[in-house]
């Protein structure tokens, strides 16, 4: 019998988690909370408008740890990081809420969103409509659907639930087959290409460049994972990719928002950093 991949272990845990959570808070209770939540801030629209101007549309991620790297950031205050990102020029935020593998928490999303005016995506592994309604109840503006974790019927069901509760959807793909499935099944404008293989956790920016010609112009290509330096950003810009999801490069920096500026808006760093006398 083959050993389950990291993604397979995470997904198995998610089904258990949904059962545990729905036993504590019913779907009807969650739906009431979702209706009472603050209005969505327009995650997709914010990215699309920024990218139209050929300016970096950065989804800045708030992530304490990962299965492949362990703890990434020791000093972890989500509200503080969110404010730093907003000052640094982020267009949107991504907050990890997975507890077991990423040391995330629902409250991190709430704390981050309350501290800023930016739209926020709940970064988690969605396998059930319950989690989608839960995301809206937490105040999220968008949810992530990972094609490699879902069949087409489930993907469509989750996207329909997201639409019902007013959430945008970012669909994430890693190869051509997944891209084809995503484009066929969903009408979301946000197509994320994860340069990290979620089964092996290996990273290659070539993944985005290979899939880019197959992403229609009426969709927004978002490159995810592996953007670590200015050369990576410039490589994407040459290929007309202006939307990014970046986490680790920022999380390892003492000042995440300043690192965001260095990577994406270096001319602003020159203006804000005064030379020593």
Swiss-Prot record:
Its EC number is 4.1.1.48. It catalyses: 1-(2-carboxyphenylamino)-1-deoxy-D-ribulose 5-phosphate + H(+) = (1S,2R)-1-C-(indol-3-yl)glycerol 3-phosphate + CO2 + H2O. One of its GO terms (molecular function) is phosphoribosylanthranilate isomerase activity. It comes from the Bacteria. The keyword Amino-acid biosynthesis applies. Pathway: Amino-acid biosynthesis; L-tryptophan biosynthesis; L-tryptophan from chorismate: step 4/5. GO terms for biological process: L-tryptophan biosynthetic process. It is an enzyme of class 4 (lyase). Keywords: Amino-acid biosynthesis, Aromatic amino acid biosynthesis, Decarboxylase, Lyase, Tryptophan biosynthesis. The keyword Amino-acid biosynthesis applies. SUPFAM superfamilies: Ribulose-phoshate binding barrel. HAMAP family: IGPS_B. Belongs to the TrpC family. This is Indole-3-glycerol phosphate synthase. It comes from Pseudomonas putida (strain GB-1). The lineage of its organism: Bacteria, Pseudomonadati, Pseudomonadota, Gammaproteobacteria, Pseudomonadales.
């Amino acid at each position: 019998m083959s050993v389950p991949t990291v993604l397979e272990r995470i997904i198995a845990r998610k089904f258990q988690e949904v059962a545990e959570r729905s036993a504590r808070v019913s779907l009807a209770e969650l739906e009431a909370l979702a209706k009472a939540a603050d209005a969505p801030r327009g995650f997709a629209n914010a990215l699309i408008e920024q990218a139209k101007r050929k300016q970096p549309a950065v989804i800045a991620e708030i992530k304490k740890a990962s299965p492949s790297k362990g703890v990434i950031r020791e000093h972890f205050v989500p509200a503080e990081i969110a404010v730093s990102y907003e000052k640094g020029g982020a267009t949107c935020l991504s907050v990890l809420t997975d507890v077991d593998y990423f040391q995330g928490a629902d409250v991190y999303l709430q704390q981050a969103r309350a501290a800023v005016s930016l739209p926020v995506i709940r970064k988690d592994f969605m396998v059930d409509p319950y989690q989608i309604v839960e995301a809206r109840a937490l105040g999220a503006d968008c949810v992530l659907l990972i094609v490699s974790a879902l069949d087409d019927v489930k993907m469509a069901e989750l996207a329909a639930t997201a639409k019902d509760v007013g959430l945008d959807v970012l669909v994430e793909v890693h190869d051509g087959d997944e891209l084809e499935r995503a484009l066929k099944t969903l009408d979301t404008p946000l197509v994320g290409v994860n340069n990290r293989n979620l089964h092996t956790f290996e990273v290659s920016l070539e993944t985005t460049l290979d899939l880019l010609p197959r992403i229609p112009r009426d969709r927004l290509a978002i490159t995810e994972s592996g953007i670590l330096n200015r050369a990576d950003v410039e490589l994407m810009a040459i290929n007309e990719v202006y939307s990014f999801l970046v986490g680790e490069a920022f999380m390892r920096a003492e000042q995440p928002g300043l690192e965001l500026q260095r990577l994406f808006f270096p001319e602003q760093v020159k203006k804000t950093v005064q030379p020593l006398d």
